[in-house]
Amino acid sequence: ICGGFIALHDAFTRMISAGKMANHPIEEELAAVSVGVVDGEVCLDLPYVEDSTAEVDLNVVMTSSGKFVEVQGTAEDGPFERKSLEEMLDAAAVGITEITEAQRSLLSTPPVERAN
């Protein structure tokens, strides 16, 4: 999702530069992270080893303004408390804020032109 957002932004920027579009349709950045509970602790951006043993596994997609686009999760090892969900969503929001800030910084530079 994060890479797709960058590619889409670059494509729109190129279309504007080529005169095929007048305005950039993207209103804000979009990013996604995985978050879960491993050994009772909330973990952000789970690598495979942690993901494969997580008690709870969530994928969260948010905008840079903190609005949710998607929350998808599974209780892998039995039901979990609402408090755990809130902690995971808070951790996801922190991670997504970092990613969208990096996207904003990256996208402030012109896209790399490729040779045809």
Protein language model annotation of sequence segments:
Residues 1-116:
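Polyanion-binding surfaces on beta-sheet-dominated domains and ring/shell assemblies
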